[in-house]
Amino acid sequence: MKKIVLYGGQFNPIHTAHMIVASEVFHELQPDEFYFLPSFMSPLKKHNNFIDVQHRLTMIQMIIDELGFGDICDDEIKRGGQSYTYDTIKAFKEQHKDSELYFVIGTDQYNQLEKWYQIEYLKEMVTFVVVNRDKNSQNVENAMIAIQIPRVDISSTMIRQRVSEGKSIQVLVPKSVENYIKGEGLYEH
């Protein structure tokens, strides 16, 4: 049975902390396949500074190239509108019947899982991998996996704000992503 990891997020933009999460999960679980799953629009997040989806996909591919593993699953992008993880996983599972699916979330998402659409069915379809960036270890439900990673206080919101203020984002994102953001004039308004 294939082991497949799905790492969802807006990735607007993808950054160094996302790379650390991907790397830690990849090396801990050693999956056969690893997918970055960019959302079109998350139902639980505000949508400020939204850029053309192609920019996000390009930056994710740059991260994949740098990490040396992973692919992009753009199912939610193709669907458009609000993305519910349940719908995405259900469709993905139909395409990958003989696979064990692992879905990466942070402790912030873990703490609001009860708000997720069809969460009980979703728990039957995937094993949640809860990534904790805090000093204290996270207690998770028995059917879930907790992975502790180094705390890195970087957020996409911070990066967008720094760019709009003309501040440096060096090392917050890989050089290729930094150059792309500058070259395309992203987040400057």
UniProtKB/Swiss-Prot annotation:
Belongs to the NadD family. InterPro entries: Cyt_trans-like, NadD/NMNAT, Rossmann-like_a/b/a_fold. Catalyzes the reversible adenylation of nicotinate mononucleotide (NaMN) to nicotinic acid adenine dinucleotide (NaAD). One of its GO terms (molecular function) is ATP binding. This is Probable nicotinate-nucleotide adenylyltransferase. HAMAP family: NaMN_adenylyltr (MF_00244). GO terms for biological process: NAD biosynthetic process. It catalyses: nicotinate beta-D-ribonucleotide + ATP + H(+) = deamido-NAD(+) + diphosphate. Its EC number is 2.7.7.18. The keyword Transferase applies. Keywords: ATP-binding, NAD, Nucleotide-binding, Nucleotidyltransferase, Pyridine nucleotide biosynthesis, Transferase. Pathway: Cofactor biosynthesis; NAD(+) biosynthesis; deamido-NAD(+) from nicotinate D-ribonucleotide: step 1/1. NCBIfam families: nicotinate (nicotinamide) nucleotide adenylyltransferase (TIGR00482), PRK00071.1-3 (NF000840), PRK00071.1-4 (NF000841).
